[in-house]
Amino acid sequence: MENGQGTGSKLGLPPLTPEQQEALQKAKKYAMEQSIKSVLVKQTIAHQQQQLTNLQMAAVTMGFGDPLSSLQSVAAQRQRALAIMCRVYVGSIYYELGEDTIRQAFAPFGPIKSIDMSWDSVTMKHKGFAFVEYEVPEAAQLALEQMNSVMLGGRNIKVGRPGSIGQAQPIIEQLAEEARAYNRIYVASIHPDLSDDDIKSVFEAFGKIKSCMLAREPTTGKHKGFGFIEYEKPQSSLDAVSSMNLFDLGGQYLRVGKAVTPPMPLLTPTTPGGLPPAAAVAAAAATAKITAQEAVAGTVLSSLASPAHILSQQMGLPQAVLAAQAPGIITGLSTTKTVFHLVGLVNPVLASPPVTAPASMGTPTSAVQLHTEVKREEDSRRTAEDHSAPVGNGQDSELERLSVSASAGRQAAIQSKSTVMVLRNMVGPEDIDDDLEGEVMEECGKYGAVNRVIIYQERQGEEDDAEIIVKIFVEFSDAGEMNKAIQALNNRWFAGRKVVAELYDQDRFNSSDLTA
């Protein structure tokens, strides 16, 4: 059985060729790795459920409120902080430079998800600044460190954090503190032809490596040009960053920096008594091995009558080899790398292998169920918050009208779901410049996450000398944050003007009707 011929001789099948035996071994290795990943996910879910049970018991014992809402709130805050950490503000951009130039300049630090450049509808030119969003926070951190004051198009560009980072600063600091417990570094601008082993062999010069993993596309299996390396000693990671940043490897200059987030940033720190990572991986490997041994007999017998088995006989390849070479599957992975760090903004509870593991070890449905329940609870909580949030300054009079008029009640319900604030009488046409939008976003970012800012000039007549009124629309990600901004900014004085901050109808805003 060890040489891959025992089963064939018993069933009257021809012996495997050396190439087929090699492919079969690769398939077995890959199946074992996927099984270990699946078991690790199950362990994570079980550990989280145990933490939740402990929180609930503590809440009942001590008379606290619902712990589930608190746990969800922490997860949502960490998710929002990670999203903010992935964005950088780029200012002082020369007006002739376009999005392609910005992308080319900032792409070496990591994959870019989006570039948001604000355009002037009159001049059809951008307003001199942009927001670049990366897939991982480490890419944004490197861009922030290495691109500020760099000459681009004859100007020294300004690179900084978005204005909305202020509110998330405590959580960002907490993530950074958790990241310091791991000796991880981030490596970007990796040549497409280099493999995990190539990178590991280069960086091993600075110390013993615990794990080296490049982020890969789930469909093609090709790496995305970045990855994470974890050393055993802190000094090794420091030496690697100082020596390998801007190192020419394969014709591309590497970008190397310290990791600013833990391996699984959406998880709160493990409580004392939890299983250490190494022990968890070892336990997962043992569990996967036992499960695989139990499934061997049933899998072999059932495969004899399957269509895949018939196809394998026609092609001269065993079924296991066909499975190993199916589209979207990565073969030839090393089983010695049993530490699986998830990179980017991926919920570790939902992180599943790129392909389905063997039938007896499929993707755990409990993870999907848990996510669905948590999502439903979060939506219910947000809906309740939205309906209870104050609506502008005339809340008392609005409540009176609600009791009298059903139509007014429906209107109030629609408005309570709006996340758009309009600022009136804040500036005049002569005060509009390239920095105004960024300044408004930074100021409003103190009250919550700002999706976008629109500066609208409304002419009050068809005459050439008709008065122009400037309205500034600010869209938040949450209605509660928008209401905080209204309460803080309404009737506030700015440059000799008394600002009026009001809620704006969401449907009008979505349909680009800014005239109300």
UniProtKB/Swiss-Prot annotation:
One GO term describing the cellular component: ribonucleoprotein complex
Any GO MF annotation of the entry? RNA binding
Q: List all Basic and acidic residues biased stretches.
A: 372-388
Which cellular compartments is it found in? Nucleus
Looking up Pfam families in the UniProt record yields: RRM_1
Sections of the chain in a coiled coil: none
Q: Does the keyword rRNA processing apply?
A: no
Q: Name one GO biological process term.
A: apoptotic process
Q: What does this protein do?
A: DNA- and RNA-binding protein, involved in transcription repression and pre-mRNA splicing.
Q: Read off the domain note.
A: The third RNA recognition motif, called PUMP domain, is atypical and may rather mediate homodimerization and/or protein-protein interactions.
Q: List the protein's name.
A: Poly(U)-binding-splicing factor PUF60-B
